[in-house]
A protein has these predicted regions:
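Fold-independent oxyanion-binding glycine-rich loops
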Residues: 20-21, 46-47, 69, 112, ...
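Catalytic alpha/beta core domains of metabolic enzymes, predominantly
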Residues: 1-131
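Beta-strand/loop-dominated core regions that host nucleotide or nucleotide-derived cofactor-binding catalytic loops
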Residues: 165-171, 175-198
Length: 202
C-alpha cells in the first residue's frame, strides 16, 4: 500500500490493484489482507500458475477461495498455453461460484467397469459442442458411461445421454426418452439443445 499512497499523492485515485503470486496460499492471504485495508477494486489471479493441467488446478483453488470470500473485481487465469483456455477456465470458475450466468454446465461420470463407450472422447465432444450454446443459461447436460446408473445419475440434468453397447439412451430430467444408435448420440443431443434454444426464443 506504500506505492498506492505514493500514487495518490501524485493526484491519481482511479486505480485497480493487482497482487499476484505463484504460491496459492500466499496469494490468498495477500488478498485477504489488502481487502481489509483498501476499497480499491482488485484484479486477482495466480500468476505463473503453470501448464494447462497444473495451472487450472492452482487457479481454481486460489481464485475459488478468494472469490468465494467476496474479494476481487476482475480475474485472470494465467496458463502456459493457448490464451483461449484461460478464458474458458475463468468462465467455468465464475460459473461454478455462481458469479457468472450463461452457458451450459456439462457433468460426466468417471469411467468404470460398466462403461461400454468411449466416454472420454464423447464428454470432450459434448463440452466443445456446449460452448456453441452460451445463450442457454442454467442448462445442465449429463454425459454418462452406462445405461445402468446413467439415468439415475443424470436425474438432475435437463438433458443427458448414456452410452451402451452400440447404442445409448437419451434422457430428459432423469427419464429415459428413447434408445439411440451410438453414432447418433451427439447429433441427437445437439438437436435437443437446439430445441431448447428455440423454445426459449419463442
Amino acid at each position: 500500500l506504500q506505492k498506492v499512497d505514493m500514487i495518490e499523492k501524485m493526484g491519481y485515485d482511479n486505480l485497480v490493484i493487482s497482487i499476484k503470486s505463484s504460491d496459492v496460499l500466499m496469494c490468498v492471504k495477500a488478498h485477504q489482507l489488502i481487502a481489509e485495508r483498501t476499497n480499491y477494486p482488485l484484479h486477482v489471479g495466480i500468476t505463473e500458475a503453470g501448464t494447462v493441467f497444473s495451472g487450472n488446478i492452482k487457479s481454481a483453488v486460489g481464485l475459488g477461495i478468494i472469490l468465494s470470500q467476496g474479494i476481487g473485481d476482475t480475474i485472470r487465469v494465467s496458463l502456459t498455453g493457448d490464451p483461449v483456455e484461460e478464458i474458458k477456465s475463468a468462465k467455468v470458475i465464475l460459473r461454478t461460484l455462481g458469479l457468472r450466468k450463461g452457458g451450459i454446465e456439462v457433468v460426466s461420470c468417471p469411467t468404470c467397469g460398466r462403461t461400454r463407450i468411449d466416454l472420454i472422447r464423447l464428454a470432450d465432444q459434448v463440452e466443445t459442442m456446449a460452448a456453441e450454446f452460451d445463450d442457454l443459461d442454467g442448462v445442465k447436460v449429463a454425459v454418462m458411461g452406462c445405461v445402468v446408473n446413467g439415468p439415475g445419475e443424470a436425474r438432475e440434468a435437463d438433458v443427458g445421454i448414456a452410452g451402451g453397447i452400440g447404442e445409448g439412451l437419451l434422457i430428459r430430467k432423469g427419464q429415459v426418452v428413447r434408445k439411440v444408435p451410438e453414432e447418433e448420440l451427439l447429433t441427437v443431443l445437439r438437436r435437443e439443445l437446439e430445441e431448447m434454444r428455440s423454445e426459449r426464443r419463442n
